[in-house]
Amino acid sequence: MSVMFDPDTAIYPFPPKPTPLSIDEKAYYREKIKRLLKERNAVMVAHYYTDPEIQQLAEETGGCISDSLEMARFGAKHPASTLLVAGVRFMGETAKILSSEKTILMPTLQAECSLDLGCPVEEFNAFCDAHPDHTVVVYANTSTAVKARADWVVTSSIAVELIDHLDSLGEKIIWAPDKHLGRYVQKQTGADILCWQGACIVHDEFKTQALTRLQEEYPDAAILVHPESPQAIVEMADAVGSTSQLIAAAKTLPHQRLIVATDRGIFYKMQQAVPDKELLEAPTAGEGATCRSCAHCPWMAMNGLQAIAEALEQEGSNHEVHVEERLRERALVPLNRMLDFAATLRG
């Protein structure tokens, strides 16, 4: 695998943490959101990495809690005229690309993703221009402009299958932006891949020494790892997969104790799936006992109850997602290819 670009030195400023709400304030905003969803003919689409109270609200109001692939499917098929996307900005943009006729609202448009930030379109276009004989495959965690340059968009849940398919056709591949997922896919498929060097700030923080110590403390535990994690962490895993695949693995593994190396937001749905099992967070702190993300995306944490209520009530430039039509049409092509390919996998 060749490595052509290294944005590792980028340090992304974290957003301020939302102000904690009292029990009464939470109850007030929950009821307000439920009322506004009905009034607006809106439905919530929430990612597994949002806070538990946000996922619970999506459940209670008939919304969706899922990985980014299922979020895209659900939003496109749901009859609601407005989608409230609780996640990060690329998820809102993806919803708009697939459902241009709908109003797409987000609690904040400032909810970024380090993978998206680490793949600026100008540099990525230059990278692709330098390798015109390669098929361009980009992860869903990218901007509309980067998707518009791609031949395929892919999520972690179908990444191995898609790259294996392209490799069987003899295609050379540009993969962006996650270097760890790219390395994992290359190892699984043997494909010829040029890999962009982005990383998720959460998964990149998992440490082998700390994980080994936790494993020694709980030798009966299985280790579940998202493939956005470093290779050394992936190699320690009993199960590797996307968020939905890790939840499925939690159910099928016989172990009663699970160490989970992904954003701790997943614990809400995973614990529902395995109520009798003990879930442990994989450590992100290094030898200095410090961490930046501490196993929770700071931008996902921006999706608070107050911000959701404000988005439904105020709309406007601070909350509504807009995508340039020219870019939307171009990005729709690789997104639809992904959805069509995923449909063939489901049979």
Swiss-Prot record:
Iminosuccinate binds at H47, S68, Y139, A140, N141, S156, H226, P227, E228, T243. Pathway: Cofactor biosynthesis; NAD(+) biosynthesis; quinolinate from iminoaspartate: step 1/1. It catalyses: iminosuccinate + dihydroxyacetone phosphate = quinolinate + phosphate + 2 H2O + H(+). [4Fe-4S] cluster binds at C113, C200, C297. The gene is nadA. Binds 1 [4Fe-4S] cluster per subunit. Belongs to the quinolinate synthase family. Type 1 subfamily. Pfam families: NadA. Keywords: 4Fe-4S, Cytoplasm, Iron, Iron-sulfur, Metal-binding, Pyridine nucleotide biosynthesis, Transferase. Its EC number is 2.5.1.72. GO terms for cellular component: cytosol. Catalyzes the condensation of iminoaspartate with dihydroxyacetone phosphate to form quinolinate. Its main location: cytoplasm. It is found in: Cytoplasm. GO terms for biological process: 'de novo' NAD biosynthetic process from L-aspartate. One of its GO terms (molecular function) is metal ion binding. PANTHER family: QUINOLINATE SYNTHASE, CHLOROPLASTIC, QUINOLINATE SYNTHETASE A. This is Quinolinate synthase. Its cofactor is [4Fe-4S] cluster. Gene3D superfamilies: NadA-like.
